[in-house]
Protein backbone atom coordinates (compact mmCIF):
# COMPACT_ATOMS: atom_id res chain seq x y z
CA UNK A 1 0.00 0.00 0.00
CA UNK A 2 1.27 3.45 -0.95
CA UNK A 3 0.31 6.68 0.79
CA UNK A 4 1.39 10.05 -0.57
CA UNK A 5 1.39 13.03 1.74
CA UNK A 6 1.05 15.96 -0.64
CA UNK A 7 -0.45 19.37 -1.23
CA UNK A 8 -2.56 19.94 -4.37
CA UNK A 9 -0.67 23.12 -5.32
CA UNK A 10 2.82 21.80 -4.55
CA UNK A 11 4.67 21.23 -7.86
CA UNK A 12 6.89 18.60 -6.25
CA UNK A 13 3.76 16.69 -5.19
CA UNK A 14 2.30 17.03 -8.69
CA UNK A 15 5.52 15.57 -10.10
CA UNK A 16 5.23 12.53 -7.83
CA UNK A 17 1.52 12.08 -8.64
CA UNK A 18 2.50 12.08 -12.32
CA UNK A 19 5.22 9.48 -11.69
CA UNK A 20 2.79 7.24 -9.83
CA UNK A 21 0.38 7.48 -12.74
CA UNK A 22 3.10 6.74 -15.32
CA UNK A 23 4.07 3.60 -13.41
CA UNK A 24 0.42 2.60 -13.05
CA UNK A 25 0.60 2.69 -9.26
CA UNK A 26 -2.35 3.49 -7.05
CA UNK A 27 -1.87 5.39 -3.82
CA UNK A 28 -3.92 6.92 -1.07
CA UNK A 29 -3.50 10.70 -1.10
CA UNK A 30 -3.36 12.61 2.16
CA UNK A 31 -3.43 16.39 1.83
CA UNK A 32 -0.84 18.01 4.08
CA UNK A 33 -0.85 21.70 4.96
CA UNK A 34 2.83 22.05 5.76
CA UNK A 35 2.39 25.40 7.49
CA UNK A 36 0.42 23.66 10.25
CA UNK A 37 3.58 21.74 11.22
CA UNK A 38 1.68 18.64 12.40
CA UNK A 39 3.78 16.54 14.73
CA UNK A 40 2.75 13.28 13.04
CA UNK A 41 3.88 14.62 9.66
CA UNK A 42 7.13 15.99 11.08
CA UNK A 43 7.87 12.47 12.33
CA UNK A 44 7.71 11.30 8.69
CA UNK A 45 9.75 14.22 7.35
CA UNK A 46 11.48 16.48 9.87
CA UNK A 47 12.00 19.03 7.06
CA UNK A 48 8.21 19.49 7.11
CA UNK A 49 7.89 19.56 3.31
CA UNK A 50 5.77 17.66 0.82
CA UNK A 51 5.78 15.22 -0.85
CA UNK A 52 6.39 12.20 1.37
CA UNK A 53 5.68 8.68 0.14
CA UNK A 54 4.94 5.97 2.69
CA UNK A 55 5.45 2.42 1.43
CA UNK A 56 4.82 -0.57 3.66
CA UNK A 57 8.10 -2.15 4.74
CA UNK A 58 10.23 0.94 4.00
CA UNK A 59 11.03 4.11 5.91
CA UNK A 60 9.13 7.23 4.85
CA UNK A 61 10.51 8.55 1.55
CA UNK A 62 10.69 12.37 1.58
CA UNK A 63 11.24 14.64 -1.41
CA UNK A 64 10.32 14.41 -5.07
CA UNK A 65 13.77 13.43 -6.35
CA UNK A 66 14.22 10.74 -3.68
CA UNK A 67 10.76 9.35 -4.46
CA UNK A 68 11.51 9.42 -8.20
CA UNK A 69 14.73 7.46 -7.69
CA UNK A 70 12.94 4.95 -5.44
CA UNK A 71 10.14 4.41 -7.97
CA UNK A 72 12.65 4.05 -10.80
CA UNK A 73 14.62 1.46 -8.83
CA UNK A 74 11.53 -0.48 -7.77
CA UNK A 75 9.37 -0.22 -10.91
CA UNK A 76 11.62 0.96 -13.75
CA UNK A 77 13.31 -2.26 -14.77
CA UNK A 78 12.88 -6.00 -14.82
CA UNK A 79 14.71 -8.33 -12.44
CA UNK A 80 17.22 -9.29 -15.14
CA UNK A 81 18.23 -5.62 -15.48
CA UNK A 82 16.61 -5.05 -18.87
CA UNK A 83 15.08 -1.59 -19.01
CA UNK A 84 11.33 -1.72 -19.22
CA UNK A 85 9.76 1.47 -17.89
CA UNK A 86 12.53 3.83 -16.88
CA UNK A 87 11.18 7.35 -17.11
CA UNK A 88 14.41 9.31 -17.02
CA UNK A 89 16.30 7.87 -19.99
CA UNK A 90 18.34 4.80 -20.74
CA UNK A 91 21.85 6.17 -21.30
CA UNK A 92 23.85 7.99 -18.62
CA UNK A 93 23.74 11.15 -20.76
CA UNK A 94 19.94 11.03 -21.04
CA UNK A 95 19.59 10.40 -17.32
CA UNK A 96 21.93 13.29 -16.48
CA UNK A 97 19.92 15.70 -18.64
CA UNK A 98 16.60 14.47 -17.22
CA UNK A 99 17.88 14.91 -13.68
CA UNK A 100 19.38 18.32 -14.49
CA UNK A 101 16.06 19.60 -15.81
CA UNK A 102 14.12 18.07 -12.92
CA UNK A 103 16.50 19.91 -10.61
CA UNK A 104 16.11 23.13 -12.61
CA UNK A 105 12.33 23.09 -12.29
CA UNK A 106 12.21 21.61 -8.81
CA UNK A 107 14.75 24.01 -7.33
CA UNK A 108 15.43 27.09 -9.45
CA UNK A 109 12.01 27.60 -11.08
CA UNK A 110 10.26 26.78 -7.81
CA UNK A 111 12.35 29.18 -5.71
CA UNK A 112 12.20 32.01 -8.26
CA UNK A 113 8.70 31.70 -9.74
CA UNK A 114 6.12 29.09 -8.75
CA UNK A 115 6.93 28.90 -5.02
CA UNK A 116 6.67 32.65 -4.36
CA UNK A 117 3.53 32.99 -6.50
CA UNK A 118 1.80 30.01 -4.87
CA UNK A 119 2.76 31.19 -1.40
CA UNK A 120 1.58 34.76 -1.93
CA UNK A 121 -1.61 33.96 -3.88
CA UNK A 122 -2.73 30.67 -2.34
CA UNK A 123 -1.05 29.51 0.86
CA UNK A 124 -1.23 32.82 2.73
CA UNK A 125 -5.04 32.67 2.52
CA UNK A 126 -5.07 29.62 4.78
CA UNK A 127 -2.34 30.70 7.19
CA UNK A 128 -2.73 32.63 10.38
CA UNK A 129 -0.61 35.75 10.84
CA UNK A 130 1.67 33.73 13.13
CA UNK A 131 2.18 31.19 10.33
CA UNK A 132 3.10 33.91 7.82
CA UNK A 133 -0.36 34.57 6.45
CA UNK A 134 -1.81 37.89 5.48
CA UNK A 135 -2.16 39.90 2.30
CA UNK A 136 0.04 39.03 -0.69
CA UNK A 137 3.38 40.83 -0.90
CA UNK A 138 3.19 42.59 -4.27
CA UNK A 139 6.97 43.07 -4.45
CA UNK A 140 7.48 39.30 -4.21
CA UNK A 141 4.84 38.73 -6.89
CA UNK A 142 6.40 41.31 -9.24
CA UNK A 143 9.83 39.69 -8.84
CA UNK A 144 8.39 36.24 -9.62
CA UNK A 145 6.64 37.61 -12.73
CA UNK A 146 9.93 39.16 -13.90
CA UNK A 147 11.75 35.88 -13.29
CA UNK A 148 9.27 33.83 -15.28
CA UNK A 149 10.32 35.58 -18.50
CA UNK A 150 13.87 34.24 -18.13
CA UNK A 151 12.61 30.72 -17.46
CA UNK A 152 10.15 30.75 -20.36
CA UNK A 153 12.90 31.97 -22.70
CA UNK A 154 15.06 29.04 -21.59
CA UNK A 155 12.21 26.56 -22.10
CA UNK A 156 11.65 28.05 -25.55
CA UNK A 157 15.33 27.67 -26.39
CA UNK A 158 15.31 24.02 -25.26
CA UNK A 159 12.16 23.33 -27.28
CA UNK A 160 13.79 24.86 -30.36
CA UNK A 161 16.89 22.66 -30.03
CA UNK A 162 15.26 19.28 -29.36
CA UNK A 163 12.16 17.21 -29.94
CA UNK A 164 11.51 17.06 -26.17
CA UNK A 165 12.81 19.24 -23.34
CA UNK A 166 15.30 16.64 -22.10
CA UNK A 167 16.42 15.39 -25.52
CA UNK A 168 15.31 13.95 -28.81
CA UNK A 169 13.63 10.84 -27.37
CA UNK A 170 10.59 10.63 -25.13
Model regions: which residues?
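Amphipathic alpha-helical packing segments from all-alpha helical-bundle domains
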Residues: 139-159
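Surface-exposed helix-capping loop/turn segments at secondary-structure junctions
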Residues: 77, 157-168
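GST-like domain detector, emphasizing the conserved glutathione-binding G-site
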Residues: 1-142, 165
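Short amphipathic alpha-helix initiation/capping segments at coil-to-helix junctions
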Residues: 148, 168-169
Amino acid sequence: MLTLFHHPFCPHSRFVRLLLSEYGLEADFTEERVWERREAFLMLNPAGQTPVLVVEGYPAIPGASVIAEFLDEMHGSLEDGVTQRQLIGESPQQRIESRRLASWFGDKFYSEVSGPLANERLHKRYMTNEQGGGPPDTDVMRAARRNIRYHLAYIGWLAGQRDWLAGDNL
